[in-house]
A protein has these predicted regions:
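N-terminal Rossmann-like NAD(P) cofactor-binding subdomain of oxidoreductases
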Residues: 1-172
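Oxyanion-binding "anion nests"
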Residues: 175-186
Length: 186
């Protein structure tokens, strides 16, 4: 039996992941009391019991958790904090022919973002085959629902009265300052 701790289980991603993993008979999902969810020392005690820790936390909290975990167990990070970090393996098995093996043997795996994943799977093969130059300037137009913004954004937008004017798309990231840009350049 593999012990899994979902750090951030009460968040949007953590809840969905816990629901899916609960169906697996080969996994035991380790729990933490609700009043200890943000207590790093309480979470650290659970890290030592886990074979795998899945971080479903905001970026800074994921960095702090990863430091506390160290080499105690395998870690999968769903945040953007470690996606381009040199000591983490990018969790996109289709990225290269050897990536699946890298992921299988890795101690620290960063979960790819949705936009970068789609972008990389489309553009990278074109560059590798010489069909597209790596220097070509590209634009990625993408739309998302608000759930991608996490619990705070969901709460804010669900409390806002629904009207046509308030439901239009919002433009952002036009100055290449979006958090996924560096990941899309892998």
């Amino acid at each position: 039996m593999t012990n899994v701790f979902i750090d951030g289980q009460a968040g949007t991603t953590g809840l969905e992941l816990a629901s899916r993993l609960a169906k697996r008979e080969d996994l035991t999902i380790l729990q933490i009391p609700e009043d200890s969810r943000k207590d790093l020392s309480a979470r650290s005690a659970i890290y030592t019991k886990a074979d795998i820790v899945i971080l479903c936390l905001p970026d800074q909290a994921a960095v702090e958790a990863a430091e506390a975990i160290g080499d105690k167990c395998k870690v999968i990070d769903a945040s953007t904090a470690h996606r381009t970090h040199k000591d983490w393996t990018y969790g996109l098995p289709e990225l290269t022919s050897a990536q699946r093996q890298r992921i299988a043997g890795a101690e620290k795996v960063s979960n790819p973002g949705c936009y970068p994943q789609g972008y990389l799977l489309l553009v990278r093969p074109l560059i590798e085959e010489g069909i597209l130059s790596a220097e070509t300037l590209l634009r990625c137009n993408a739309l998302s629902g608000y759930s991608g913004g996490g619990k705070a954004m969901i709460s804010k937008l669900e409390k806002t009265p629904c009207n046509d004017e308030g439901m239009v798309s919002r433009i952002y990231g036009l100055n290449l300052d979006h958090k996924h840009v560096s990941e899309m350049q892998i």
